[in-house]
Regions:
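Active-site metal-binding loops of divalent metal-dependent hydrolases
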Residues: 7-8, 40, 132, 164-165, ...
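Beta-strand-turn-beta hairpins that frame and shape the catalytic cleft
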Residues: 1-4, 81-85, 89-94, 107-129, ...
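His/acidic metal-ligating clusters that form di-metal
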Residues: 114-128, 140-170, 184
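N-terminal, active-site-proximal structural segment of metallo-dependent hydrolase catalytic domains
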Residues: 1-63, 67-75, 79, 254
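Surface-exposed cleft-lining segments at the edges of enzyme active sites
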Residues: 10-14, 42-43, 98-104, 130-138, ...
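Active site of divalent-metal-dependent phosphoester/diester hydrolases
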Residues: 16, 46-51, 63-87, 167-241
């Protein structure tokens, strides 16, 4: 089972265009079964009316979808709308829940989207998709409390926490970069950084030039034996589609 996390930059590519077919091609080629998306606008308003790029993307990929807004509206060049996180799945999404995260006055709203997926008739898999504050580690730690609270109910069940955590992580086992507090807290709560456990290739996801690690897939210890690999996807199309590169982890599911 392939699980992907991808910040789609409010649907704007580096060429300034909203190209949903381009994103669909990237995800289709990745062979992802489940996708967590950050910086998703849904629905989108333009001077010509309302569109739903998230639903269009899901239709192109023949996937179920869920969306949770972050209580924030973003204005782009030519389009605008509520921003949040989304989940796409080749398997049926049974239900979804949106959790608003703490924020300081005059800062951006953030949220955690929970999607429970029926990967088999009698087995479910839960995805938690989030995007933490971009400015301060202290705010991210505060928001992380709101992330961990619902996760505790799933401690004994298969689940993943993934998304854009906006915290610069170590780049490999021999990295001299200190483990940031957000990652330490998650580790102390029983979560494994998928790239540090099974990473292959260069780990940076943002920005495209000289990238850092800010996008993560966190795996509970009960699921770690199934983790097979984790890598950042690259390619010409990916370099044009967003200001982030997608991160994918592969699990044995039996």
């Amino acid at each position: 089972m392939n699980v992907l996390t991808y910040n789609v930059h409010l649907w704007e590519g580096r060429d300034g265009r909203m190209d949903i077919e381009r994103l669909a091609t990237i995800i289709e080629h990745s062979q992802a079964d489940i996708v967590a998306l950050n910086e998703v606008l849904h629905p989108v308003e333009t001077h010509f009316g309302v569109s739903r790029p998230l639903a269009e993307l899901a239709n192109l990929l023949r996937m179920d979808w869920a969306f949770g807004e972050s209580n924030r509206v973003v204005q782009m060049a030519g389009w605008w709308g509520p921003v949040g996180n989304a989940v796409l799945s080749r398997h049926p999404i049974l239900d979804d829940t949106n959790h608003y995260l703490a924020r300081l006055p005059m800062t951006q709203g953030r949220n955690l989207l929970t999607a429970r997926i029926a990967v088999e008739p009698e087995r479910t898999f839960t995805i938690f998709s989030t995007h933490l504050d971009h400015a301060f580690e202290g705010t991210r730690l505060w928001q992380l409390r709101g992330v961990l609270a619902p996760l505790r109910d799933y401690a004994a069940e298969p689940h993943l926490l993934l998304g854009d955590f906006n915290t610069h992580g170590p780049t490999g086992p021999n990295s001299q970069r200190l483990t940031p507090p957000v990652v330490r807290v998650l580790r102390n709560n029983g979560y494994v950084d998928a790239y540090m456990a099974a990473g292959e290739g260069e780990p940076g996801t943002f920005p495209l030039l000289w990238p850092f690690r800010i996008d993560y897939i966190f795996v509970p210890q009960i699921l770690q034996p199934q983790l097979q690999s984790c890598c950042v996807l690259t390619g010409k199309l990916i370099e044009q589609a967003s200001d982030h590169r997608p991160l994918m982890a592969t699990f044995a599911w039996n």
